[in-house]
Amino acid sequence: MRIRKIKFRDDVLLGSLELNFLNFSTGKPYENVVFVGENGVGKTTVLSLLKHFLDRPERCYFYNYVEYEIHDIVYSFERITERADGSTQINFRDVTNNQILLLNGLVDEDYPDEGNPNRQNSIFSFSRNDNVEEDEHNFDEIIERLKSLQEEDCINYVYHNIKHPDSTKKWADFFETSKMHTFAKAFNNFFDNMTYFGMGFDHDKKKVIGFTKYGREIPTSSLSSGEKQIIERAVPFLEQMNDEKDNLCLIDEPEISLHPKWQAKIFSFYKDLFLDIDGKQQNQIIMASHSSSLLKEALAHPEDTLVIRLKDVNGLIEAQRIEHPTYLGHITYAEVNYLVFGIPTPEYHNQLYCEIQNRFNKCKVKKCDEFIVAHPNYNSAIHGKISTYGTTTYHSLSSYIRNAIDHYDNGHDFTEEELVTSIKLMQEILR
């Protein structure tokens, strides 16, 4: 299942916000959507309301329109009119075949199974503020659930061969499609020096889950809080994952408790959980994140990933697509922090200035300054600021700031407002 569009309905926080998850080039929904923005703009609220819709769409009153697809068939729920008695008319449609499936008075049993969103086994993972390392009992329970998943694979293997005596499989072939193979592959790809190798028995004949670090077997009690976090949040996904691996996943702040290097890899970790045997992602993953490292990785995959920035504009929440490609020839943390979080930095300013020099063959600062001044978007009243360095005079604010950064001892200061003004001009030049 994949979400395509949402139109909210006078929500307390989100108002009448509209979200579109479609790739305009293909007309298909993005496989991955990442929400970003300051605290309080509704990232987690969007995920929570989506979960409510997936559970009981007829009992949700936050939306005017939701469009989704299941196995390439597009369905929609739409609230059309308010009746005199205060009730709402609901239109449930098969958009692909232009058929009205149900109108008004919806109850769960009324839905055609193939179009019912709460038959799709979506998975929702909230962020955790508590440290699993401080609650060993909780993590012990997670490990027991991991053992159960391993046993489930074994039972399914035996059941398959009993049910299909004429086409029995070797364990190695069956394991390729199993949940624990999925986990092992994603886990081992994530960690450089740590591996999961399966379930075994200790000297007391008790079942144990096997991990190695730097080639040495380690007990689960010695795992770090970040390592435990990866396992803890992965287990519910494995438990609810269906055979087709096409569960819709809603994940709030997957980077919690993780080092920045791991934050950069967690995006791929969740994608890896839902790859088929040919390496193709089968589901849609919708995340909310504050991590520059995760977002840098997300922005590097514009073919299947959409980044949406939610922002408060005079009390109204608006959605802004972070479009691709970026202004630079490659993605940098400085650009991510500006485009996604609205944080201007001298580093990003100079990256843009250097990009202009390289792209337009203006290697000398003076030549670049003249090029900027001659650009149609340049306005001397806004973008002009005369400065000198040695015997050379520069006329643009961008060159002034560039020289102030590179020659910090020249006594030239600049404000954040000037920094943003110069950044916006250079973005227009590079657009």
Q: For each predicted feature, which ranges?
A:
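Coupling/switch segment of ABC-type P-loop NTPase heads
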Residues: 72-74, 78, 82-191, 337-344, ...
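Short, flexible/disordered secondary-structure transition segments
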Residues: 61, 197-198, 347, 412
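A structural detector for beta-sheet-dominated domains
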Residues: 4, 9, 20-22, 69-71, ...
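Extended helical coiled-coil dimerization/tether regions that scaffold
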Residues: 2, 7-11, 22-24, 131, ...
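Short beta-strand-centered segment that lines the nucleotide-binding/catalytic pocket of NTP-utilizing
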Residues: 58-66
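RecA-like P-loop NTPase motor core
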Residues: 2-5, 13-15, 20-25, 271-280, ...
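Switch/communication elements of ASCE P-loop NTPase nucleotide-binding domains
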Residues: 1-57, 204-331
